Regions:
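A short, hydrophobic C-terminal helix/tail in secreted or cell-surface proteins
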Residues: 173-177
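Conserved loop-to-helix interface motifs that mediate assembly, gating, or partner/ligand docking
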Residues: 2-172
C-alpha cells in the first residue's frame, strides 16, 4: 500500500503535469490563431483568383494548351505540404493519407515535399522524394512557389511527368476540428 508521502507526491506530479498541459494548450492556441490569421488574409485573393480563372475558362470556349492536356508520361508529381514538426493533430496524417490511399502505384509518383513530416513518412514507405523544399515552410515567399512551379512545368514539358497535383486540406473553424 502506498504511503501518505507517495500519494502526496503523485498528486503533486499530476497537478504539475496539468499545469504544463494547460500552458502548452495556451501556446498552441496563440500559434493557431496566428496561422489562421495568415491563412484568412489570403482567402479573398485566392477566391477572386479562382473566380477569375473560372470566368476566363467559361468564356474562352475550347482552349488547347499543353498545360491543360494530359502529359505523355504516366508519372505524377504530387506537391505535399505538411508541417516540419509534429503536434499538428491529424493534419500531417490527412495529407499523407491522400497520397497513400490514392490508388496510384508509388512507383508512378514523384513527391515534392514541403515539410519534413510528410517527406519522412512517405520516404519510409518507399515513395520517390524528388524535391525537398522543407526549408520554405516557415516563411514561404512567392519566389519559392515560382521556383517549384518552374521546375515542375519544365519536367512536364520534357515529358518526365504527365500530371501535377497538390495535396492539401482546407482550414475549418477551430471548434469543428
Amino acid at each position: 500500500m502506498a504511503s501518505m508521502r507517495d500519494i502526496k507526491r503523485r498528486r503533486d506530479s499530476i497537478q504539475s503535469t496539468g499545469q504544463i498541459t494547460k500552458a502548452m494548450k495556451l501556446v498552441s492556441t496563440v500559434k493557431l490563431q496566428k496561422a489562421k490569421g495568415k491563412a484568412e488574409s489570403t482567402k479573398p485573393y485566392s477566391d477572386l483568383m479562382y473566380e477569375t480563372i473560372c470566368n476566363m475558362l467559361a468564356r474562352s470556349g475550347n482552349i488547347n494548351h499543353k498545360y491543360l492536356q494530359a502529359g505523355e508520361s504516366e508519372r505524377k508529381a504530387v506537391i505535399t505540404i505538411t508541417a516540419n514538426r509534429g503536434l499538428a493533430g491529424g493534419y500531417n496524417t490527412n495529407i499523407t493519407k491522400l497520397i497513400t490511399e490514392s490508388g496510384i502505384p508509388k512507383e508512378d509518383i514523384d513527391i515534392i515535399a514541403i515539410g519534413t513530416k510528410g517527406r519522412d513518412y512517405l520516404a519510409r514507405r518507399g515513395y520517390n522524394i524528388t524535391d525537398d523544399c522543407s526549408d520554405v515552410i516557415n516563411e514561404p515567399l512567392y519566389t519559392d512557389a515560382r521556383d517549384i512551379c518552374d521546375k515542375l512545368l519544365e519536367r512536364f514539358a520534357d515529358g518526365q511527368i504527365g500530371e501535377i497535383s497538390v495535396s492539401y486540406t482546407h482550414l475549418r473553424a477551430h471548434e469543428t476540428e
